[in-house]
């Protein structure tokens, strides 16, 4: 159903693994997370953002220490809504490690609704995937991909998803979802949208979009209008 459900799923997994953990998210995080905090009744702490929209890592560590939190649940942005800022996964992990918290003792969700379909196609992308240390990631299908109906995909580690799996005998299946019944058309639309372009076509499409964005920034700044 879009980025909000993907983010809820990631936060839900984090809460199930660490029931008493605190969710840390920055001021530039999507507004849906404040709703998710209420729905999941999860402890949370708001972290300051840097001027570019990226998480303030010093403030993150300061607040984890202040809370004496041993099992933080980190909400990282891979492309914020307004500035497109990408939180540095490597810095987050290094900073938490310096607190003496081992990797197995915290959860890291990545909200890649905006940039999850951009970074795989650019040279030298910022860290954002499972190899870089995340536990779950959500990507929207109606943003860069261009599906006409809001949709998205969330990917998480199987061992964590299995923790919330419930056997439903009358449908002979295990339920691992939040919403249960879902729209059967949107996955097809998202699949078709992805398949409609080759890898190289996606690279060219994204490169053109980034170049156009940079051109707009340059024009604004040359006219004395602050832009980023």
From Swiss-Prot:
It catalyses: L-histidine + H(+) = histamine + CO2. Keywords: Decarboxylase, Lyase, Pyridoxal phosphate. Substrate binds at residue 30. Coiled coil: none annotated. InterPro entries: Group_II_Decarboxylase, PyrdxlP-dep_de-COase, PyrdxlP-dep_Trfase, PyrdxlP-dep_Trfase_major, Pyridoxal-P_BS. Belongs to the group II decarboxylase family. Homotetramer. This is Histidine decarboxylase. The gene is hdc.
């Amino acid at each position: 159903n879009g980025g909000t459900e993907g983010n809820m799923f990631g936060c839900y997994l984090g809460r199930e693994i660490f029931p008493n953990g605190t969710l840390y998210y920055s001021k530039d995080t999507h507004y849906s997370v404040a709703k998710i905090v209420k729905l999941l009744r999860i402890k949370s702490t708001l972290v300051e953002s840097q001027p570019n929209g990226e998480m303030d890592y010093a403030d993150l560590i300061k607040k984890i220490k202040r809370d004496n939190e041993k099992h933080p649940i980190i909400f990282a942005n891979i492309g914020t809504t307004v500035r497109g800022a990408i939180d540095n996964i490597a810095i987050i992990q290094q900073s938490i490690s310096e607190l003496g918290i081992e990797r197995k003792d915290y959860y890291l969700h990545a909200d890649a609704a905006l940039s999850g379909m951009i970074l795989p196609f650019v040279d030298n992308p910022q860290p954002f995937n499972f190899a870089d240390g995340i536990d779950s990631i959500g990507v929207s299908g109606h943003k860069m991909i261009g599906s006409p109906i809001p949709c998205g995909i969330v990917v998480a580690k199987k061992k964590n998803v299995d923790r919330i799996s419930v056997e439903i005998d009358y449908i002979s299946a295990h339920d691992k979802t939040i919403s249960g019944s879902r729209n059967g058309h949107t996955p097809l639309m998202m699949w078709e949208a992805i398949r409609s372009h080759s890898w190289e076509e996606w690279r060219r499409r994204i490169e053109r979009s980034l170049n156009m964005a940079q051109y707009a920034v340059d024009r604004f700044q040359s006219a004395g209008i602050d832009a980023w």
